[in-house]
Amino acid sequence: MLAGTWEALVTGQVDLAIGISGEYANPGGIELRPLGELAFVFRVAPHHPLALLQGPLEDAQLVHHRAVAVADTAQRMTPITVNLLPGQDVLTVPSMRSKMEALLRGLGCGFVPEPFARAQIEAGRLVHKETARASPLARLHYAWRAERSALGLGRALQWWLAQLESPVTRLALLERHAGLLP
């Protein structure tokens, strides 16, 4: 959903991007359709110092604790940073799986998609903390290169696009993450 995904699509490294942000200027030749909205919630391990604090957490409190962030893979486009505070120490990890592992170990704190952390909350392995600032809501899309070739879209891409027309498929992609992350 960061710039690296757009870059891979625009440069032809991928034919289809699922979960991409629609906030970037479309350079042309890219078809974009809504996937849905995904709420991000603030999570920490039960043994993290922020877990003990009462009430909504203020930015002035958060800035003193290391955030865990997934690195943007963009090489040519400007990388994007989200939900980090100026001056905050950051542990940058390569994937959402790594971010969840770091949060579970108490190595930092951070916003994660609500469905990704649902099982850990239910198991008591992570704690939900309210923040004074609004929790982010991501409007996600799926996108593909419309001008793929003179022969048209490949069969696999056509199949995926047909599947993505279904609201059930789109909801499953947003909500069903049990067993995929630690």
Show which residues each predicted segment covers.
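Catalytic strand-loop-helix junctions within cyclic-nucleotide turnover domains
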Residues: R148
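A short beta-strand structural signal in non-transmembrane regions
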Residues: L140-R145
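Central regulatory/effector-binding core of bacterial HTH transcription factors
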Residues: M1-N26, R176-L180
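C-terminal regulatory
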Residues: N26-L107, V112-L137, L151-G154, Q158-P182
